[in-house]
Amino acid sequence: MVRKILQKYGIRGGCHDQHFLIDERSLDSIVDQAELSEKDVVLEIGGGIGNLTERLLEKAGKVYVIELDPALVHVLKDRFSDNEKLEIIPGDVLKLDLPKFNKVVANLPYSISSPITFKLFKHEFELGILMYQYEFAQRMVAKANTENYSRLSVNTHYFADADIIMKIPPSAFSPPPEVWSAVVKVVPRPSSFHTEDPQFFLDLVTAVFLQRRKKLRNAIVKGNHLLNVPNIKQIVAELPEEFMSKRAENLEPHELAEIANFIFKMRSTS
């Protein structure tokens, strides 16, 4: 059926991250993981030709679909013109104000996975079932002292619990991408540790992972253009050596928060 739709509208995909999921079992599993009911308002980002949209509409009470490509917007409108539960929002998800939703289910455009994810974390929702490039998903769920531990890992841990629940081969898509994909279950929650200023903490995480091979002492000083702390060298000198002699990849999220809190307090009192 999916291949017939592609042929009908003359859509080949392959550009602008257009790799359409055509494996019926994978599509069904993604929707099952969302545990949808008529009470749910679902956001789908990148509706494509509507193969996931169709399944969401069968179970959810309301579905918002954001789609950038005008040709695909036309397909969605044509396929679901009689379905009152669907609202199609044409445009760039990074530039749009998101509607209110409680669940997000999407095959995200891989080239902008990071900014989309961080934008979602700024909104309240109960559950996300999100498909990413497999390597990106690995970095999302990575722990400290592992190869994939990164800014993305820390920020994800700050906002939510995240687990890889499915791994999907290239053959499940048309056209097949060059990489494997993964579905990540994201459950937002309050942070498990305190931050004096959340944005300052996120900026510090960015700063130290930009210099991830440097010891933290040097990484913070080098990344101070993101922190704008006038007396940064003096403050860093007062931080515990057990932290400063390590690299960012060796510190747990709560330890990075302790460092951010100390610097923020010292900056505020100087």
Swiss-Prot record:
PROSITE patterns (alphabetical): RRNA_A_DIMETH, SAM_RNA_A_N6_MT
Domain of life of the native organism: Archaea
Residues engaged in binding S-adenosyl-L-methionine: H19, L21, G46, E67, D92, N107
A GO term from the CC aspect: cytoplasm
SMART domains tied to this protein: rADc (SM00650)
Enzyme category, top tier: transferase
Main location: cytoplasm
EC number(s) from the headed UniProt entry: 2.1.1.-
Subcellular location: Cytoplasm
UniProt keyword annotations, A-Z: Cytoplasm, Methyltransferase, RNA-binding, rRNA processing, S-adenosyl-L-methionine, Transferase
GO molecular function: RNA binding; rRNA (adenine-N6,N6-)-dimethyltransferase activity
UniProt family annotation: Belongs to the class I-like SAM-binding methyltransferase superfamily. rRNA adenine N(6)-methyltransferase family. RsmA subfamily.
Summary of the function given for this chain in its UniProt record: Specifically dimethylates two adjacent adenosines in the loop of a conserved hairpin near the 3'-end of 16S rRNA in the 30S particle. May play a critical role in biogenesis of 30S subunits.
Designated name of the protein: Probable ribosomal RNA small subunit methyltransferase A
